Amino acid sequence: MKLSLSRRDFGLMAAQITVGAAGTTLFGLPSALAQQKSVNLGTFGGIDAQNYIRAKNSMAQTFGPGAKVDYVTVRAGSEVISAMAGGSLDMCNIGSSPMVVGYANGLAASMVYAYKSIIDSEALVVQNSSGIKTVGELKGKRIGLPFNTSVHFAALAALKGAGLGPGDVQLINMRADTIASAWTRRELDASYIWVPVIPRLVEDGGTIIFKTGDLATTQGLAMFDGFLVRDEFKKQNPDLVLAFLKDFDTIAREFKQNPKEVVATMTKFLSVDEAAVMRSLNTFYPISAKEQITSKWMGKPGEKDTGVAKTLKVQADFLKESGQISTVPKDVGAMVDSSFAMKLAA
């Protein structure tokens, strides 16, 4: 399958961890389920729940003795899609926009869980010196952001809500790690980006004028990152997928509710300061299994009129309009599989 998704060079770093623990796996799943299994888990390497799982090595218990876990570090949703297309990545959290791009290009993968609700972890920041106060005042201005990402979609949606289209502004495709320096050089009037870049821009003469969470009130869109799983892996290893999601559900609550433990773990694991960890904690909003299967989010298996399905369809339309995909999938909501969430919610 050919995917024209690259907005940055594909770079994956794999750290193999051979798991060895006796007895049964976490949540009482027999360790025999996981023996001789190989699982490639993606992580963006930042201060998030997925990397907290890696730091705690909780998968050693979840997958049991004999299981081999490879942690694959990715830098963007496009890398997740490319790695899954090549079979080198089985499960990873990903923004909903690149998820749609992958599905539209024939990637055989499913969203099995909403990783988090996006409220204030993504935002549109403007230079104070620009005098811009509203989204509608961005006409003709330079906006830096990484293309084929959730912030790309959010930016287009915010502009549309203000009566502007992509042609009314200068959208500049940039890696997240280059935006802060361009901002300092005043080469940008605005940027739509995520934490931890947001506070750096604010500290360097910026003001937030729009948050991705605002799309829920202005356009009725539930914004989220999701867990994507290769369909072949899901079919062959449903018990491992369920075990992983059970562990994530527990870790996500701990990540949010036990800041002292998270700070102690992540500052050591990533060599970052406490303030950086707290910024991520304060912008992370997990969704419980029972919430996942409501119509606001994924809904129950077979349910069509859901918040996730609506958001994916709107995103697909935006991606087609902006030339990021050639056709809109007939049923983009078909990529959602809430059967695992149903089992967790029972």
Predicted regions and their residues:
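N-terminal export signals
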Residues: K2, D9-A32
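Short, glycine-/small- and polar/acidic-enriched structural segments
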Residues: A34-N173, D189-V195, A346
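Solvent-exposed, acidic/flexible segments
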Residues: Y52, T73, G77, N148-H152, ...
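Sec/Tat-exported extracytoplasmic proteins
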Residues: F63, S88, N93, Y103, ...
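Short, surface-exposed acidic
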Residues: K68-V69, P166-V169, S271-N282, S326-G333
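Pocket-lining segment of extracytoplasmic ligand-binding domains
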Residues: S97, T178-L270
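Secondary-structure end/capping motifs
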Residues: K235-E321
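Conserved C-terminal helix/tail region of periplasmic/extracytoplasmic solute-binding proteins
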Residues: A309-A346
